């Protein structure tokens, strides 16, 4: 079994060694320009077109929680990957716990009004504020996949009213489920904290815009943990300036690194991190990939395959 690996920033030698230990019958190599030798599987992140084009692979693994980086390149270069070759994304591999940590900490930060107390501290003002109640602090999760389910599960323990919005109805205990555009308004109008975990598809690009934000209660919060292209940044800033939104926490941006001239850097009610909410944890990724390859070789059912038509 031949496996090729490509990632622009990961330590390729470590991955090659770890994969060969996990799959003793495999020969793993780092792909380099000009390598046209046969391979059975490819592990990639933002691969050059020539790496995959024309190859008769059994499967491709995207080294991230989504396959959108490859799918977007396929739109421009359909010859890059034959439609018959399955594409897999990393299922959880430690990302679920990281998303739980991030989401819970930020919801509690807003719920306990730490953002307000930081603003008072900057003014040297000693001023206890009225508490929020859980009943008025409904959390809505856009995107009900593996990570959305993990975040909902972690927030349940804190007693917040929970709701989710997705393509298909969910039956998660203690979570109200809303489906499709026809139920989006009902989902939004009682959502105090909006958490975005949507996949990156043609239908979701720019979805967090002025029309959507206007349907949230006054003084709502937005937490974007999915993709920067989901947010119309000018609309978000306008909603913050008008008071429609009380705060935003952003981990992802339409352009990364975020340009120095972006007004997001300087807005007092925008907090941000540099796309670190849930990073690939190598050991857990190796475990998932090696297990899935073994199942594929045995003809067993597997999970994590990207539906190219849906985009996730």
From Swiss-Prot:
Its main location: cytoplasm. The active site is at residues 227, 275. It catalyses: glycolate + NADP(+) = glyoxylate + NADPH + H(+); (R)-glycerate + NAD(+) = 3-hydroxypyruvate + NADH + H(+); (R)-glycerate + NADP(+) = 3-hydroxypyruvate + NADPH + H(+). Pfam families: 2-Hacid_dh_C. GO terms for cellular component: cytoplasm. It is found in: Cytoplasm. The keyword Calcium does not apply. Its EC number is 1.1.1.79, 1.1.1.81. Gene3D superfamilies: NAD(P)-binding Rossmann-like Domain. The keyword Nucleotide-binding does not apply. Catalyzes the NADPH-dependent reduction of glyoxylate and hydroxypyruvate into glycolate and glycerate, respectively. This is Glyoxylate/hydroxypyruvate reductase A. It comes from Salmonella dublin (strain CT_02021853). The gene is ghrA.
